[in-house]
Amino acid sequence: MNTFGTRLKFTSFGESHGVAVGCIIDGMPAGVKFDEEFLQNELDKRKGGSKFATPRKESDKAQVLSGVFEGYTTGHPIAIVVFNENAHSKDYDNLKDLFRPAHADFTYFYKYGIRDHRGGGRSSARESVARVAGGAVAAMLLREFDICVQSGVFGVGTFVSNLKEEEFDFEFAKKSEIFCLDPKLESDFKNEILNARNSKDSVGAAVFTKVSGMLIGLGEVLYDKLDSKLAHALMGINAVKAVEIGEGINASKMRGSCNNDALKDGKFLSNHSGGILGGISNGENLILKTYFKPTPSIFAKQESIDKFGNNLKFELKGRHDPCVGVRGSVVASAMVRLVLADCLLLNASANLNNLKNAYGLK
């Protein structure tokens, strides 16, 4: 499906080499200050064009078509479109019948019987423009509650930061070309990406996300837990293969006496749970890690088959990220913002007191 969310519904549209990509955000309350400069800044962070990303250069100028009047949301659907200006579709002519390894070509074709071979269509990282735009709008609502979502890269290939989570440097990441959270590893990360690119290959990456200013009570029990919603959102990003919350995999190696977050004087003494207990936020920082596979589009010679079953050897053309996880850090923040904004709105009717307060009743 192309729609995400329960109370705040986000729908993306468009293909990598189509006319445009964009989104519709439905359910945003009226009266939220709309920050168009922030929206554009988020899209600019996601843009390619550097030696650490795809050479494809797009202006990515957002056009807000509806849902905003005199600087504030109206409560009606917000439509945002970004036109594609620099697609080189001819680079993909030789792929019309070919299934690229590790891409969605094979599965899209056998599911739908038709696929857009130009840059991968909907399965392209280009679709993430819409996610970042939607996440920026969600952030405008979260600001009203002082909830802040930040992401950065803590691992590239075999190079992984050994800093403690509280030591990650988000201020440094804001200035880093690759959103690196560990200043001592930035050069290693960059070299790993460039080495992969120069050898006609690609490399994976690990992204850390922290949410501060969290409220208690976001998320539902059982099947709509906050952690399951976050995992759903992050796993829906192209190239993501794993998500951890709190201690994540490490929790399976621990004793309960170490993993439990004790309380004293009304405060948690640790945050192994990553800010979520029983599927509901406990007010501590949300801690998430998202793992991206290497970009499947590489320039080394590969083997595959075409839709007729013929064995083929081929070399790709086009413009591709040597490490899709770098720009993926911006997308991770966007998806987390969409989840939290949705949960925030759902929580307004979680109990009778909340509902009465919405109508000024006691």
UniProtKB/Swiss-Prot annotation:
List of residues binding NADP(+): R46
Transmembrane portions of the chain: none
Matching PROSITE patterns: CHORISMATE_SYNTHASE_1 (PS00787), CHORISMATE_SYNTHASE_2 (PS00788)
GO BP terms in the entry: amino acid biosynthetic process; aromatic amino acid family biosynthetic process; chorismate biosynthetic process
UniProt cross-references to Pfam families, sorted A to Z: Chorismate_synt (PF01264)
EC number: 4.2.3.5
Keyword Cell division in annotation: no
Signal peptide location: none
InterPro entries: Chorismate_synth, Chorismate_synth_AroC_sf, Chorismate_synthase_CS
Cofactor info, note text: Reduced FMN (FMNH(2)).
Cofactor: FMNH2
MF terms in GO: chorismate synthase activity; FMN binding
Catalytic activity as recorded in UniProt: 5-O-(1-carboxyvinyl)-3-phosphoshikimate = chorismate + phosphate
Coiled coil region boundaries: none
UniProt keyword terms in alphabetical order: Amino-acid biosynthesis, Aromatic amino acid biosynthesis, FAD, Flavoprotein, FMN, Lyase, NADP
Pathway the protein acts in: Metabolic intermediate biosynthesis; chorismate biosynthesis; chorismate from D-erythrose 4-phosphate and phosphoenolpyruvate: step 7/7
Binding residue positions for FMN: R122, S123, S124, N238, A239, G278, K293, P294, T295, P296, S297, R319
GO cellular component terms attached to this protein's record: cytosol
Record HAMAP family: Chorismate_synth
Complexes and interactors: Homotetramer.
General function of this protein: This reaction introduces a second double bond into the aromatic ring system.
Family: Belongs to the chorismate synthase family.
Protein name, UniProt field: Chorismate synthase
Species the sequence originates in: Campylobacter jejuni subsp. jejuni serotype O:2 (strain ATCC 700819 / NCTC 11168)
Lineage: Bacteria, Pseudomonadati, Campylobacterota, Epsilonproteobacteria, Campylobacterales
Gene: aroC
